Each structure stands twice: as structure tokens, then as C-alpha cells.
């Protein structure tokens, strides 16, 4: 299957300090890839680099970042700006801070339609109503004139999805889209994203730290730690046989996934290292129960089974 997005050797740094290191990632049409890891692992910065929205003084470097054959890092800024929202769209973490509190919901959904599709305000608002209905907002024709504060957290997140889908993007980046939502609404949003990915033949990169979200939504899983990809596999294979010690630790810490009964959940000791204080060799080494001397040497991401790669000497 041809990749919609093919990233090779992506690195992001600030003042010479790397926050993403040599990342390779392929995203396929109609599939949802979950990028999982603790806070500080480089997940969000990976998404921002795809959008070319890494804040200054951040520096993006890569062998290639091919989107449908075009290298995004070589596009002029004007050409990249036209890609954002039209071909590549993003759902941000906090819908209340991402929505403009002094603009009606309909106008915010209509804006990318007016910009990228040259629709009139009337036509764009009519399309906004259709999009609101598509993402499950009831009474869309009435609510299109409401303000952001009149929507619940779950409904605001649906508005953000409607905005992201307005121009029918081929790639959707979703950065922790369900973090602030209760478990019922979270499930609804995840099922909605998965359904839209299939129906629209759209590639989705879903960023999360929650393996429950991964189990609900993922076709493929990519695990990041300290700026590196440490494991990548189809979701079914990943949950059946996680190989990297970090992946195994995350699984053991997840309720209902690797732990049963009334016992206290285990935790992974220590913290993700600061980008400026990375250890030699395996970045997970200081927290790993299987650490040995050779783990101080650099390790490559190796394929251990079709589609399943891991960065660990022990595998």
C-alpha cells in the first residue's frame, strides 16, 4: 500500500538540543496510527513539524517528508500555507482555548471554506451546518449561531473536528483530542474519527498517552520515548506482543489492559529524561529492568516480524 505521508530521519531541535531524533514514520490512507508515549516524548512536536508550525527557534531537519510525493520541507511558505487546512489539518488539545470566544461557531467553521474553497459567507455557513451534523451536533441549523461558551466540552471537540474536516483533508493530525472528556464522550469521539478515516480514505495520526485510547482507535501503533521511535506495529500485534520494555511497562500500568484485580497498579520508575540530559545509548536504560552494559551503545529500529519494529538489543 502506498503511503500518503512518508517521513524519513525527522529531527527537531531547539538551540541544538534535540527533541525529536531520527524519526521514520509512514501513514496510510484510511488508517489511524496512534503515536503514544509519556509527556515530553516528542509526540506533539512531531505533529507540529508535519504542519511546519514548530515555534522559533525550533529547527526541523529530515532526509524527506513526502506527502503524496511532495517534500513538505522543501515547499515555499506560501505553498505550505495553502496545504494547511486543505490537505493537512489538525485538531488541537484544548478546544476552549483553540476556539475564538467572540466569534460564533458557524463563522469559525466557515472560515477555512471561504479561504481555501472561495465560497461565499452564505455558502460556507450552509456547509458548516452540514459539517456540524456530520460530527453529531444536534440541531445544527440552530446551533450554528451559538457561541463557544454555549457548548459542552464534548460538543466543542466536535466543533474542532468539524473545522478540521471542513476542506476534506487527506491527513488529519489529532493531538490528544479526548484528554479533557469523560469516558463516554471520549469513546464517541474516537469512534467518530475512526469512521471518518475509513469513509473518507483519510490518514489519521492520533497522538495520545492513553493506551485505552489506542485500544479503541488504532489500526497501527508507534511508541515514542525521549524523541525516538522505540516500537512500531499493527495494533493487534502490539497488544498481543509488545516487545520493547517501555511498551511493556506502559501496558502493565494501564487498567484493564495488563492488570487485573484489586492490586495497586505498577508504575515505571523515574521520568522521561530532559532532551539536554539524554543518557548514553538507550534513552530508556536508566528506567529499564533489563538494562545491561551493551545498552549504553546506540541501537537501531529493527524489524522483528512483518510490520513490527523495535529498538532494543534484548529482542
Segments the model singles out, each with a brief description of its role:
Residues 109, 161, 185, 189:
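Hydrophobic anchor residue at the start of the ABC signature
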Amino acid at each position: 500500500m502506498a503511503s500518503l505521508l512518508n517521513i524519513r530521519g525527522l529531527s527537531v531541535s531547539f538551540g541544538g538540543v534535540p527533541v525529536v531524533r531520527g524519526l521514520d514514520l509512514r501513514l496510510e490512507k484510511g488508517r489511524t496510527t496512534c503515536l503514544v508515549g509519556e509527556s515530553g516524548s516528542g509526540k506533539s512536536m512531531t505533529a507540529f513539524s508535519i504542519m511546519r508550525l514548530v515555534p522559533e527557534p525550533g529547527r526541523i531537519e529530515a532526509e524527506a517528508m513526502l506527502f503524496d510525493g511532495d517534500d513538505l520541507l522543501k515547499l515555499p511558505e506560501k505553498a505550505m500555507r495553502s496545504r494547511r487546512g486543505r490537505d493537512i489539518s489538525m485538531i488541537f488539545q484544548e478546544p476552549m482555548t483553540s476556539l475564538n470566544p467572540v466569534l460564533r461557531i458557524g463563522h469559525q467553521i466557515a472560515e477555512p471554506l471561504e479561504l481555501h474553497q472561495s465560497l461565499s459567507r452564505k455558502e460556507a455557513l450552509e456547509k458548516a451546518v452540514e459539517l456540524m451534523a456530520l460530527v453529531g451536533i444536534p440541531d445544527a441549523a440552530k446551533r450554528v449561531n451559538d457561541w463557544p461558551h454555549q457548548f459542552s466540552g464534548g460538543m466543542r471537540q466536535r466543533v474542532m473536528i468539524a473545522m478540521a474536516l471542513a476542506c476534506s483533508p487527506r491527513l488529519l493530525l489529532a493531538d490528544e483530542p479526548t484528554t479533557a472528556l469523560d469516558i463516554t464522550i471520549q469513546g464517541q469521539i474516537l469512534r467518530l474519527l475512526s469512521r471518518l478515516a475509513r469513509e473518507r480514505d483519510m490518514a489519521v495520526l492520533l497522538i495520545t498517552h492513553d493506551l485505552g485510547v489506542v485500544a479503541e482507535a488504532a489500526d497501527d501503533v508507534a511508541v515514542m520515548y525521549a524523541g525516538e521511535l522505540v516500537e512500531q506495529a499493527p495494533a493487534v500485534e502490539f497488544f498481543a506482543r509488545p516487545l520493547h520494555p517501555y511498551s511493556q511497562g506502559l501496558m502493565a500500568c494501564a487498567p484493564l489492559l495488563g492488570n487485573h484485580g484489586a492490586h495497586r497498579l505498577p508504575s515505571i520508575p523515574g521520568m522521561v529524561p530532559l532532551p539536554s540530559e539524554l543518557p548514553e545509548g538507550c534513552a530508556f536504560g536508566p528506567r529499564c529492568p533489563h538494562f545491561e552494559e551493551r545498552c549504553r551503545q546506540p541501537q537501531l529500529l529493527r524489524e522483528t516480524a512483518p510490520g513490527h519494529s523495535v529498538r532494543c538489543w534484548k529482542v
